[in-house]
Amino acid sequence: MFSEDEYRLDFFVDEGFQRKKCEKCGKFFWSRDAQRNTCGDPPCDPYTFIGSPIFKREHTLDEMREHYLSFFQARGHARIQRYPVVARWRDDIYLTIASIADFQPFVTSGQVPPPANPLTISQPCIRLDDLDSVGRSGRHLTTFEMMAHHVFNTREREIYWKDRTVRLCDELLAGLGMDPLAVTY
């Protein structure tokens, strides 16, 4: 387990977050809401966004994809094209199950450079490992689009790490109109 210092980011201090312990699961989390007692993750808190959007307005898939990619592009990330959903470059998986799978093992091992660094992508994914759970909640899907931003740091060159990652996430959510008190990390 990592120490508290590993998670005490400048961003959390700058933005007035408090480190709290979830009263249900016992895990630690960060929140701006002094009254919050739970981490926000299921099963500690139910899904509340289904049928009740958390942003200022509803977005179509195309609008959300464009907003996300444009957000990161405006902050120095190259927009790259999606990879195939059949992971032909892999011998350990058949389908692209996550955006990072696009870059494994060759980029993540350092064998080849990334197509851009940093980058943003909206990757169609297929997962079949929890078919029995599909439809029970908004959590289990067979196909989805994983919008991601990736940075490939090396010992010689660190582009950014945890603090900037969380800052970007928070800025994206705020720009979409999410209540900052509802956000937990």
Model segments located where?
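Short cysteine-rich clusters marking metal-coordination/redox-active sites
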Residues: 22-25, 39
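Long, compositionally biased low-complexity segments enriched in polar/charged residues
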Residues: 6-8, 67
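Short, low-complexity intrinsically disordered segments
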Residues: 27-28, 159
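Basic, low-complexity terminal or inter-domain segments flanking catalytic cores
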Residues: 1-5
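Structured aminoacyl-transfer and RNA-binding surfaces used for tRNA recognition/handling
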Residues: 49-185
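Short, solvent-exposed secondary-structure boundary motifs
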Residues: 19-23, 169
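Short, flexible, mixed-charge glycine/proline-rich loop motifs
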Residues: 9-17, 28-33
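Cysteine-rich micro-motifs
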Residues: 33-47
